[in-house]
Amino acid sequence: MNPYEPVEGLYVNAKQYHRILKRREARAKLEERLRGVQTTKKPYLHESRHKHAMRRPRGPGGRFLTADKVSKLRAQEAAEAAANGGSTGDDVNATNANDATVPATVSSEVTHTSEGYADSNDSRPSSISNSSESPAPINSATASMSPANNTSGNNITSPNVRGELDMSGNIAMSGGPTNTASTSGPVPHDMTVLPQTDSNTSNLMSSGSQLGSFATASTNGNNSTTTTTSSAAHPGSFHKGTNDYSSTLAGNEHSAFPGLDVYHDDSVSAGAAFIPHNPMDSIDHLDVNDPTATGLPVLPASDIDPLNLTGNTQDSMIIGQQTYPSHGSSGTMK
């Protein structure tokens, strides 16, 4: 079959003809789209060629310049530089030389300025001089302290400063300024403050002359013991309280009544309101709302805390509800 001879047309029906036209239109659109993508796609460059392309001079629009145009531009720049009579911006040595002279000039100006402050009649003290004459290392403990803090003793911002209370009632600072700062209020004449001997033990002795009372408190961890003798409120009465949160104290006949018992001497007056009662029963099956129940003290919650109801050789006592005046000692003894 000769391809150059005219070929007799093939017969197709209407449906086949419509399908052939649709296929030709779709193929033409696809070829046109692929042709546009291939023209806009960036060509692949090897790494070395890419670096070379990045070093090549570009003109307006990012297009590479030809060698002829590049030589013309360089000749034009050289002529402009010769006409100006100066060096171009590419002269790195001249720039570095100019930069090297700047620190010396600045340091000399700073030196003269600081000396002028030291010699002039300024409001600042004359002992302040520049850092080149008397260099002093900056310590982290004193970095946050202003010059006013070195003389006042009240504004203390250093984390290493610790305060200690001496015998005269003043706070002596260790690790910071050696000045002493007195407490906010005067120390009463009837109160003696003992120095602290242990980090976990603190003793406080106070005597109240107004009520004739004597109080001693010592703290060891969670245990605190309070001994109080009041001649004004209860003449001849003697109370001792112990708070031990780590153990359960037992009353008479091994009954569980933790942290509560009463000591008293034989010279109890009628004002103390001690009422003999039956031995204490276990607190587990007692009616708390019934004040006449065996072993329950008739006391408000504020008066039960400083009492100790263990170890007495007599019957347990119920102390009537009674308001106890303060003993005049500073601090809470619990």
Swiss-Prot record:
Gene3D superfamilies: 6.10.250.2430. One of its GO terms (biological process) is regulation of aerobic respiration. It comes from the Eukaryota. One of its GO terms (cellular component) is heterochromatin. Residues 48-58 have a biased composition (Basic residues). SMART domains: CBF. It holds the Pfam family CBFB_NFYA. Its main location: nucleus. Keywords: Activator, DNA-binding, Nucleus, Transcription, Transcription regulation. GO terms for molecular function: DNA-binding transcription activator activity, RNA polymerase II-specific; promoter-enhancer loop anchoring activity; RNA polymerase II cis-regulatory region sequence-specific DNA binding; RNA polymerase II core promoter sequence-specific DNA binding; sequence-specific DNA binding. Global regulator of respiratory functions in yeast cells. It belongs to a complex that binds to the sequence CCAAT located upstream of genes involved in mitochondrial electron transport. Belongs to a heterotrimeric CCAAT-binding complex. This is Transcriptional activator hap2. It comes from Schizosaccharomyces pombe (strain 972 / ATCC 24843). The gene is hap2.
